[in-house]
Structure formats: C-alpha cells, structure tokens
Amino acid sequence: MNPKSNDANDSQNGTLQKNESAKSAKEIVMEYLQLITERQDFKSARSYLKDNVSYVSPLNSFDRAEPYLKYNESLHLPKLDIKKIFVDGDDVCILHETSLPRISSTVFTTLWFHVDGGKISSLRALFDPRPFIRPQR
C-alpha cells in the first residue's frame, strides 16, 4: 500500500489493509442489515456482498449475490429485534427475533456472517422453519 494514500485498498495486491479507514466486520454487517430491512435498498445492499456470496438456511441456499438479494426482497423483512451480537475477527453472529405478520409468527434466528476483504462472503441463517411450511389455519 502506498504510505501516502488514505485508501483502504492496496491496489498492488487487492487486499484490504487494517487501518482507521477500513470498516469492521460488525459495521459492514450492521449497515447491510439496515439496508435490506429498514431501508429496503437492495441496490445499495449489493455493494456489501461478494459476487459469489454463499447463503444457506433451512429453506434456501444461494451462491450468487443477485438471486440471494432477489429472495431477500421478496421477504419484505421488518427491522430485526436484535438480542445479542458476537464478533470474532471477520465473523459476526447475530441472535434476533423477527415478527412476521404474513405468517402470524415471531421467529428466533441466528445469523452467522463472514466478511472477507470488506464484503460479506457467506451467511448462514439458522431458525425453526415450521412456521413457513405448515398450512395456514
């Protein structure tokens, strides 16, 4: 990295350098979640994801950003009621509840994000899928 540059990206080797201008994994994840829930700004959210982002949950899996974001857009996710956040380097784990009026249920979910080079490279969502698959009464 050019010592005179304030840029977080090292143009010679493409790696993100640790300095004041680099966002933490937690900051990246929290900004991304705000974009897809509160703001519903999926175009801006795309810039937080690697092209080959991996998403796995009990109901779906994706290995590219565009189909994953389209899926998220269809969910109309409300703001998350975050209970706890754990951070370990480039890994961020969020425990939250989401109230889903369309299925008359509140779902407790664990999200495990991995951030690589300043972008989200993987996300694992763990939750009980029964409210999504049982017939409506």
Predicted regions and their residues:
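C-terminal and inter-domain tail/linker signature
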Residues: 1-137
